Regions:
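Short hydrophobic core segments
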Residues: 20-32, 72, 152-162, 222, ...
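FAD-site-proximal beta/loop scaffold in flavoenzymes
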Residues: 43-65, 138-145, 150-224
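A short, polar/charged loop-to-alpha-helix boundary motif
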Residues: 292-311
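Rossmann-like dinucleotide-binding cores of NAD(P)H-dependent redox enzymes
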Residues: 76-133, 214-215, 238-243
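Glycine-rich dinucleotide-binding loop and its adjacent helix/turn
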Residues: 29-88
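A conserved short coil-to-beta-strand element within the FAD-binding core of flavoproteins
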Residues: 1-11, 127-140
Length: 325
């Protein structure tokens, strides 16, 4: 059943069929995918968003070899969907309104690598071009008009334009909200016996307010919440890490690149490469592409607040492991 309202003063959650008292309350309300206004994917049979296993199963059951797919959004969700669709023999066009794919989350070097990978696998990528409108016949999309004036005949559309944290319950309880439910280092909201964890939360990381959309963050915050409810007085220390699998590429990311002013490229063997984000002389994050060794070293350096010199990174013969001692 669904919770309808939280009463922090009475420490009570209301449901359609009654209510429940609490001593401690945990909000792990997650997030929902952004829709394409004015289109509602629940009413259009071949318009999909991607958020959970049910979405993935619905898309997989629908697509067949030779179908024409339009993906709206060049973030990780859209790109992973493109890679999967190509494995099924689907004809894929991806549009991204920004000047390059992954602009919000990655450096140009990472965007360039992944763009080339997709093009080599037959994906048509259109950057700085957005969706103008969809032509709906009955309950299906049949055509898409793009902002460059072109039209694409489509068999189905996947929308990957980000997510919105589910904060309605928290807002109704007058908890503090800022791009998510605000929490402190104990994962407490603005009401001390109400906690929150996962995609729905925002918090301070290196003096910047962030919201992390990752499995690791959700697990770590949930652990912190449980420990504090059990009076273990635990503080949550964010250790951001992410990954993305596309074709034979494994991209692993450690840290957050917010505010970077330089990217150092370290080449490895064959198709291995890593991109290291710096602000001044401080290491912020690393994107490791098919390079798990650099990912693990970078992750440990960031967590230890250590920064190799940029020349050390550029030197392919320099053993980064010595920096971990």
């Amino acid at each position: 059943k669904s919770a309808l309202k939280i009463d922090p003063n009475q420490q009570r959650v209301e449901f359609s069929d009654g209510s429940l008292k609490y001593d401690h309350l945990v909000l792990s309300t997650g997030s929902k995918p952004r829709e394409l206004p004015p289109y509602n994917s629940r009413k259009i049979k071949n318009l999909f968003t991607m958020r959970d296993l049910n979405d993935a199963n619905s898309i997989e059951a629908f697509m067949k070899s030779g179908m024409r797919l339009l993906i709206v959004g060049g973030g990780y969700i859209g790109l992973e969907a493109a890679a999967t669709a190509r494995k099924f023999g689907v004809d894929v066009t991806l549009v991204e309104i920004e000047e390059r794919i992954l602009k919000r989350v990655a450096a140009k070097e990472t965007s360039d690598y992944i763009r080339s990978l997709h093009i080599s696998n037959g994906v048509k990528i259109k950057e700085a071009i957005g969706l103008d409108k969809l032509e709906i016949v009955g309950e299906k999309v049949v055509n898409a008009s793009l902002t460059d004036g072109s039209d694409i005949n489509v068999d189905f559309v996947i929308v990957g334009i980000g997510i919105t944290p589910n904060t309605d319950l928290a807002e109704g309880a007058n908890l503090k909200i800022n791009n998510g439910i605000l929490i402190n280092e104990k994962c407490q909201t603005s009401v001390s016996n109400i906690y929150a964890a996962g995609d729905c939360t925002s918090f301070k990381y290196k003096n910047t307010l962030v919201r992390l959309e990752s499995v690791g963050n959700a697990i770590d915050q949930a652990t912190t919440v449980a420990q504090n409810i059990m009076k273990q007085n635990t503080s949550y220390t964010p250790k951001p890490w992410f990954w993305s699998d596309q074709y034979d590429l494994k991209l692993q990311i450690a840290g957050l690149n917010t505010g970077y002013d330089e990217v150092v490229v370290r080449k490895g063997e064959s198709r291995q490469v890593s991109h290291w984000y710096y602000k001044g002389q401080s290491l912020l994050a690393v994107d490791a592409l098919n390079d798990p060794r650099c990912y693990m070293i970078g992750k440990r350096l960031i967590e230890a607040n250590k920064s190799p010199s940029k020349n050390q990174l550029r030197d392919e013969n320099f053993n980064l492991k010595v920096l971990l001692k």
